[in-house]
């Protein structure tokens, strides 16, 4: 959902690939956002990432976490009336948005796409797009060792 929100903020029509409500037919290209894969590994020794000072509570908090990689599906669809060039324009805009700033908390490692194809049955142009992003899934522990919060952050932001 956050990736779809980020793309919308960048001027790219985006929806979750598996929405809670029925889909509406679009008149322009749209990105269907899904998570295709997620994997994690150690982020530090015994998952310990260090400490940070909390200004609000004026205490030190320990951070524990793991490095994670997400493969997002960002498939593009466009009605027949838009043509294949609308898919290319939407992909270019998406690539620029992901390269320049990227989704909050994530660092894009790789962006790939397939060819634009026309689905006769659906009457839509389609291009498969995938973005590999890295970040950290971390938890904040209080002095007693209880975890207070879980947060996903980009690799360069810890």
What is the meaning of each model-derived region?
Residues 1-55, 156-158:
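Small/polar-rich, solvent-exposed N-terminal microdomains that initiate assembly or binding
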Residues 41, 82, 137-141:
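Residue-level signal for secondary-structure boundary sites
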Residues 52-72, 86, 155-158:
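C-terminal basic regulatory modules in eukaryotic proteins
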Residues 17-19, 57-59, 111-117:
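Short structured motifs
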Residues 42-44, 69-103:
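Acidic, Ser/Thr- and Gly-enriched intrinsically disordered low-complexity segments
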Residues 62-81, 125-137:
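Oligomerization/assembly interface segments of phage tail-like spikes and tubes
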Residues 87-142:
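Acidic-leaning, charged glycine-interspersed low-complexity segments
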Residues 4, 8, 124-158:
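C-terminal tail/extension regions appended to the core domain(s) of diverse proteins
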